[in-house]
């Protein structure tokens, strides 16, 4: 499309673009295509196919499709990673939470150029999901209570080192060990390592070689 001379742009129709999408053999090709085609060819169907096939294609969505309706359609097609590339002010908290909840906690979520979540996304459900995924840095400190950290270590045991001293207790450490004993064990404070603590470790079989 980049190489097509202007005098041949008349051949560019939705059907032509859809044919190109359906016959594309390059994973990144879906993203590149949406980047270069004229805005008038970025129809709902074209954009939907491109974004389903490559989550980063949402960077090139026209404004008319940067909304919950389009994002929910992506979720229905099991494309959840798009949230890494959208403008976060274009999505509501319920839809954002819905996408987050579908992503495997073992998968990393890369929020590009985002230092903190916008205020409208800081709902109880979103904060829980961010903790579950270990995305602590994007949540303001005021929202990080004991339950936030407990949720985080239950899914990401390696995050035990990020738990403030005031929240560090037996329950917190055991939860981290259950999630990832190998990573969590080195962050357990000496004051927690009592005979009663080790008894619980043995009972729960929370060992790591």
Kindly give the residue locations of the regions a language model identified.
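Ankyrin repeat (ANK) tandem alpha-helical domains that serve as protein-protein interaction scaffolds
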Residues: 1-209
């Amino acid at each position: 499309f980049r190489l097509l001379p202007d005098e041949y742009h008349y051949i560019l129709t939705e059907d032509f673009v859809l044919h190109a999408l359906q016959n594309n053999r390059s994973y990144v090709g879906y993203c590149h295509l949406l980047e270069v085609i004229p805005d008038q060819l970025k129809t709902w169907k074209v954009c939907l196919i491109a974004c389903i096939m490559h989550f980063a294609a949402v960077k090139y969505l026209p404004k008319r499709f940067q909304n919950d309706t389009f994002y929910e359609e992506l979720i229905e097609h099991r494309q959840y990673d798009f949230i890494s590339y959208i403008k976060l002010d274009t999505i509501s908290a319920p839809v954002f939470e819905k996408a987050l909840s579908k992503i495997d906690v073992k998968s990393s979520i890369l929020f590009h150029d985002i230092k903190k979540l916008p205020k409208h996304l800081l709902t109880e459900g979103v904060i829980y999901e961010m903790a579950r995924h270990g995305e602590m840095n994007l949540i303001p400190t005021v929202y990080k209570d004991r339950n936030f950290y407990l949720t985080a270590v239950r899914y990401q045991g390696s995050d035990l080192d990020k738990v403030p001293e005031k929240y560090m207790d037996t329950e917190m450490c055991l939860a981290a060990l259950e999630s990832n004993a190998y990573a969590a064990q080195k962050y357990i404070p000496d004051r927690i390592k009592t005979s009663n603590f080790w008894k619980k470790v043995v009972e729960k079989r929370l060992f790591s070689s």
